[in-house]
Structures are given as structure tokens and as C-alpha cells.
A protein has these predicted regions:
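Sequence/structural signature of beta-propeller domains
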Residues: 1-275
Length: 275
């Protein structure tokens, strides 16, 4: 682990963490194999579980073939948006959780993901949405290019309603290559005029099967042009899958990141990352 990464919190009761969002003293966390949205209070260390999927026999550590694969947790105004990756037909769900009224709404992204595949020339083996940003007018979806076609890039969708998307554009983003494996997106957030992303490399060419972890990275894109500003390794052995803004001290940016350890142990570690 490199020096700009330090342990921020250890949370018992959460398994594989795939996304997070910080709102005042509440840290919201999702897992790709969980039917809960977790709310962790940073002051009293209490963990609240919000059930966002009803009628399931298993609510945590859902088997791989059945899991919703929630890889995206993003925020706009009073809503949290939780998106499935789209990597299989079972993973096409979006959950909207309205923070002010504490209500859950479900939306199908099957139609959207079909349009994305056509417009962006991404086949079923290569669609893998791992991050999203919503500005209120535009969506940016981050496709992880860990499939055999290396379709790493940003999908820009004009309009606020994803289920009615019409204008869809794809911008391929070439990051680094390590051990002959491409580094690809695992999450992204917008801060001021820049997109900050985390990315990882794995020894696999599948959006479904995990491989040996070859490292994690942080980088930045210009929010208007999607020009790559920088990419920097933050760990050689860990796979980070979620990022949220923490604080800024002068020119120093601090983020919180979470790790998907691909185990059944219900404990997760949140790290502070300084850039």
C-alpha cells in the first residue's frame, strides 16, 4: 500500500463494497451482492441497513449468478442512484433512493442498456457499467473495458430520465497497460470541473469472471472534453471499486475509497486517499 492511502474506517456488517457516497456524517455504501443500501454514521459508528430489493430469500452474499451486481452509487440533489452493471440480463436494475422521504423506487434499465449496446457498438460480453455521474441534465456512465474488446470509455447521455434516453455518445478512454492488461474504470465522481476516477487491472478478459488483481489507480478527466489529465497507481495489490469526495485542504484533495475483496466476510475497510 502506498503512502497516500490510509485506513479511514472498518465497518462490520458490510461485505463486498462497490460504491460509496458521503453526506455530512453519513457514509452510504452499496455492495454488488447485497439487497441493502448501507448507511454508516461516522460519529456513533452505527450501521443502518435500508432494504432496496424486496422478496429475495437471500439479502446479503447473494450468489454470483443471481446477484443484482450494483456497481454504481451516485448522487444528485436529494436522490441516490444505484445502478446494476448490465453485464447480464439480471443486472439491469436502477434503484432511486430519495433521501428526504426515505423511499425506494425501482426502474428497469433493460431498454437503456439495449440502446447503449447499439449506439456505442458494445456487445453483451463487453457492457459493464461501473460508475456514473448525474448533473441534473446529463448522465455520464463509465464502462469498464475489462472484456475482450477493451471497451473502456465514457457513455454520455443527454436528458435526465435514463429510461427514455435517446442521445447516446461513447468516448473511448485509453488508460494504462500493466502486465499486458489494460487498466479500466471502476468508479468516478465529479468535483468542480474535473472527473476523478478510480480504475483497476485484473488478469481476465471477462466482465463476469474475476481475475488476479494487478493494481488500482486514480486519475482525472476534464469534465467538458473528457481529456485525460493524469493516471497514478495507488495500490499494487488491491481492487478499489468506489470513490467519494471527502475534503479539500488548499491544493490537496482527499477522497474515500472502498475495496471489493470478493469474499463472503461481512466486514469492509474504507480508505482515505490523498491526491
Amino acid at each position: 500500500m502506498l503512502s497516500n492511502l490510509s485506513v479511514f474506517a472498518k465497518i462490520k456488517g458490510i461485505g463486498s463494497a462497490s460504491g460509496l457516497y458521503l453526506r455530512q456524517n453519513s457514509l452510504f455504501v452499496i455492495g454488488d451482492n447485497s439487497a441493502y443500501l448501507y448507511e454508516y454514521n461516522l460519529e456513533n459508528k452505527a450501521l443502518n441497513k435500508i432494504e432496496i430489493l424486496k422478496g429475495l430469500k437471500t439479502l446479503e452474499n447473494i450468489p454470483k449468478a443471481n446477484k443484482p451486481d450494483f456497481e454504481v452509487l451516485c448522487h444528485h440533489v436529494n436522490s441516490l442512484y444505484i445502478l446494476g452493471s448490465g453485464s447480464t440480463d439480471r443486472r439491469n436494475l436502477m434503484i432511486e433512493y430519495q433521501l428526504d422521504i426515505k423511499k425506494v423506487f425501482q426502474h428497469s434499465l433493460t431498454s437503456l442498456y439495449a440502446k447503449v449496446k447499439t449506439a456505442c457498438k458494445i456487445d453483451e460480453e463487453n457492457l459493464n457499467i461501473e460508475g456514473a455521474i448525474f448533473t441534473g441534465e446529463t448522465w455520464f456512465l463509465f464502462n469498464r473495458g475489462n472484456g475482450n474488446a477493451n471497451k473502456n470509455g465514457v457513455i454520455k447521455i443527454n436528458g435526465s430520465d435514463l429510461t427514455k434516453a435517446q442521445q447516446i455518445e461513447f468516448t473511448p478512454i485509453m488508460l494504462l497497460k500493466t502486465d499486458q492488461k489494460l487498466v479500466s474504470f471502476t468508479d468516478a465522481i465529479l468535483h468542480e470541473n474535473n472527473i476523478y476516477f478510480i480504475a483497476a487491472a485484473e488478469n481476465t478478459q471477462s466482465t463476469y469472471h474475476d481475475g488476479e488483481i494487478l493494481g488500482s489507480y486514480i486519475g482525472s478527466l476534464d469534465a467538458k472534453t473528457l481529456h485525460l489529465n493524469f493516471t497514478k497507481q495507488i495500490s499494487a495489490t488491491q481492487k478499489f471499486e468506489g470513490i467519494t469526495f471527502y475534503k479539500q485542504i488548499k491544493n490537496q484533495l482527499q477522497f474515500l475509497v472502498c475495496e471489493d475483496r470478493d469474499t463472503d466476510i461481512l466486514e469492509t475497510v474504507i480508505y482515505k486517499l490523498v491526491v
